[in-house]
Curated annotation (Swiss-Prot):
<dbReference type="Pfam" id="PF02594">
    <property type="entry name" value="DUF167"/>
</dbReference>
<protein>
    <recommendedName>
        <fullName>UPF0235 protein Swol_0959</fullName>
    </recommendedName>
</protein>
<dbReference type="InterPro" id="IPR036591">
    <property type="entry name" value="YggU-like_sf"/>
</dbReference>
<comment type="similarity">
    <text>Belongs to the UPF0235 family.</text>
</comment>
<dbReference type="GO" id="GO:0005737">
    <property type="term" value="C:cytoplasm"/>
</dbReference>
<dbReference type="InterPro" id="IPR003746">
    <property type="entry name" value="DUF167"/>
</dbReference>
Length: 102
């Protein structure tokens, strides 16, 4: 089965892509693709930026990068966000997406 397609683009040293965040989950995890965006569950609630901070921390730990290399450029108060990560290629991002079964 092919990997799902996540739309990505380069912005200088940064890799930009969309994320659909599902807060108040039982654990932090990438669950797949949603309409061309990466779907990620985070345990934190969507209160006072807690889910955004949890998303940044999760991605930083996953890719072994400092948190300063992960930024939310759009969607601070929305479940649909545009995220940029410095220091990775699209192939590395796509390698972390689990196989989706129909």
């Amino acid at each position: 089965m092919n990997k799902p397609l996540i739309r990505t683009e380069r912005n200088g040293d940064w890799l930009r892509f969309g994320v659909k965040v599902q807060p108040r989950s039982s654990r932090n995890q990438i669950v797949g693709e949603h309409e061309g965006d990466l779907k990620i569950k985070v345990m934190a609630p969507p209160v006072e930026g807690a889910a955004n901070q949890a998303l940044q921390k999760f991605l930083a730990e996953l890719f072994k990068l400092p948190k300063k290399d992960i930024r939310i450029v759009r969607g601070e108060t929305s479940r649909h966000k545009i995220v940029e990560i410095r220091g990775i290629e699209a192939e590395k991002l796509l390698a972390f997406i689990p196989q989706i079964t129909k």
